[in-house]
Amino acid sequence: VADIDDRWYRRGPDGRREKTERHGQGARWLVRWRDPQGRQRKKSFKRKAEAESYAASLEHGLRSGSYIAPDAGRVSVGEWATRWLDGQAHLAPSTLARYRDVIETHIVPRWGSVHLSSITHADVQTWISGLVGRLASTSVAKVHRVFSLMLAWAVRDARLARNPAEGVRLPRPEQPEHRYLDHDQVAALAERCGDHGVVVRFLAYTGLRWGELAALTVGRVDLRRRRVLVAESVTEVGGRLVWGSPKTHERRSVPLPRFLAEELRPRVEGRRADALVFPSPRGDVLRVRNFRRRVFDAAVREVGPEGFHPHELRHTAASLAIASGADVKIVQQMLGHKTATMTLDLYGHLFPDRLNDIADRMDQIVCAPDVPRE
């Protein structure tokens, strides 16, 4: 239970109210309570109504288990960002690097010296609104997401009662304009890449991320079953190679078309299980920047599309799989998406509209002539 003391007046021996030696000095009302650890706490207020409101919220928090210590949020956003990043070791190195960049570029310049407890929802909304126009809507959403994740961590650590970034209005997301190659375009691009054409075909028909391709070893290619086990990824972060699990931290089995399995055979048969399937010319990890600079970008300039990136071959793989009749769950498994919803959000427009097919099929079943039984 929280107690409220009047620091300017007290009751004398005769029961009458009399002034204290602190009369007229500082805040008049003092709220006292014990926190869940039994420590004595106190906070001063100028007005009695403020003290009563604070005491009521304290008692509610103590009873409900949602109590937040007054000094818990007196940590600067800059310091909290460092702690939060240190606690995200489960993230992929590339994701962690992107989060760090967002924090250093956008969050710390605005919030670095601000205490967590001083952040208001209105201030966050004003800040986010100010980013609109300077950044693309997807970038604004990423900045907000990182900031909100940091503050959610503070809520779980009992430093904030709620997340002031929740409910902030974001700009309408721009629909990504994915580009997809057809089979002939894949063949043309692969041909222009010469000996590295197999890399283009592999990405276009398996949908692996570049880091998954670069980390693929011989022991994870089963030519008989025509399967590739995606279990590892390698990412270049700040010029350094960082090995880890795939983006969703889950292994997956990806099918190989027969022609691609045959093309991989010389790269797999008779080699050590831990050898890289797609090494660089020097025998180490094939880095995407080097691949683009030496091979891919020149081929793209010849056959297009303009500015095409190796990652867009992953979109191509989804498109070709869907055109071949794969359903959403197959595409999800192939690409390693965490949920089918994510797959539909990205590629739902590529799935054919089969509503009429379903109606026609039901019509055939219901209206089929009865066949007399013998």
Set out the residue ranges of the language-model regions:
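N-terminal core-binding DNA-recognition domain of tyrosine site-specific recombinases/integrases
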Residues: 23, 42-46, 73-78, 82-164, ...
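Basic, Lys/Arg- and aromatic-enriched nucleic-acid-binding interface segment
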Residues: 25-26, 137-148, 156, 160-216, ...
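Catalytic-site neighborhood detector that most strongly recognizes the C-terminal catalytic loop/helix
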Residues: 46-48, 68, 172, 180, ...
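Alpha-helix C-terminal capping/helix-coil junction sites
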Residues: 62-63, 111, 155, 203-204
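Short functional hotspots where side chains directly engage DNA or cofactors
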Residues: 165-167, 203, 225-233, 278, ...
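C-terminal secondary-structure termini that scaffold catalytic or DNA-interacting sites
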Residues: 220, 225, 234-260, 266, ...
